[in-house]
């Protein structure tokens, strides 16, 4: 978020971040040491911030909305969406932006009704080498689909890489011998990588 604001040339007087992962916090503070960390979103109050807020943006946990997740919707980790709504109501920012995965239409409608704006679906493949469809709810005016920059996976891959980053022969064989994994990890769609996925583990 702060990178985007920097690129847009938007000066920020105070930047608050709600994060609980200690490694994410370390990275943020290394790159943006003036960031004010306020802890878990469920404990954030207007009094803690004590400033006029112009913009709030975030992405509530997607695991319970994602097709690759547990499918529990607002009853799982994705219920933290309601904390985003609560903070919006308490701080009354001029603008907001929420990002999340493409999900079931009934869940999408709940978020749309709560925020009062229709989502915009943007595929990151327009500006990167990865297919990644995401929904964005925002009251920021004049948000539009970015132009396709035509970035392919071949454009961003390094050709000379230290062997320590190579898959082992055993690992390569495991992927290529498994039909499902081979399709998932080696297929290119128009020169684009499939959506990258990661496992969420809360740090201690």
PLM region descriptions:
Residues 28:
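Conserved SAM-binding loop
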Residues 11, 31-33, 115:
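Short, structured coil segments at secondary-structure junctions
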Residues 14-16:
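Short beta-strand element of Class I
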Residues 34-40:
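Conserved SAM-binding strand-loop segment of SAM-dependent methyltransferases
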Residues 44-55, 60-204:
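Class I S-adenosyl-L-methionine
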Residues 24:
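Short, glycine/polar-rich helix-capping loops at beta-to-alpha or helix-loop-helix junctions
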Residues 1-10:
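Conserved SAM-binding loop of SAM-dependent methyltransferases across substrates and taxa
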Residues 21:
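Conserved SAM/SAH-binding beta-strand->alpha-helix loop
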């Amino acid at each position: 978020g702060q990178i985007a604001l920097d690129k847009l040339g938007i000066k920020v007087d105070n930047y608050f971040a709600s994060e609980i992962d200690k490694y994410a916090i370390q990275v943020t503070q290394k790159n943006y040491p003036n960031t004010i960390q306020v802890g878990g979103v469920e404990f954030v109050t207007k009094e803690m911030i004590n400033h006029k807020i112009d913009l709030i943006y975030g992405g509530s946990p997607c695991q319970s909305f994602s097709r690759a997740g547990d499918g529990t919707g607002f009853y799982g980790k994705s219920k933290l969406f309601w904390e985003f709504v609560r903070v919006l109501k308490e701080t009354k920012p001029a603008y907001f932006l929420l990002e999340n995965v493409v999900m079931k239409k009934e869940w999408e409608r709940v978020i749309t009704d709560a925020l009062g704006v229709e989502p915009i679906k943007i595929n990151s493949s327009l500006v990167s080498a990865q297919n990644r469809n995401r929904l964005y709810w925002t009251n920021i005016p004049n948000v539009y689909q970015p132009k396709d920059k035509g970035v392919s996976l071949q454009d961003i891959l390094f050709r000379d890489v230290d062997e320590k980053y190579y898959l082992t022969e055993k690992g390569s064989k495991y992927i290529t011998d498994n039909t499902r994994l081979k399709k998932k990890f080696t297929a290119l769609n128009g020169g684009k990588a499939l959506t990258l996925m990661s496992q969420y583990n809360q740090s201690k």
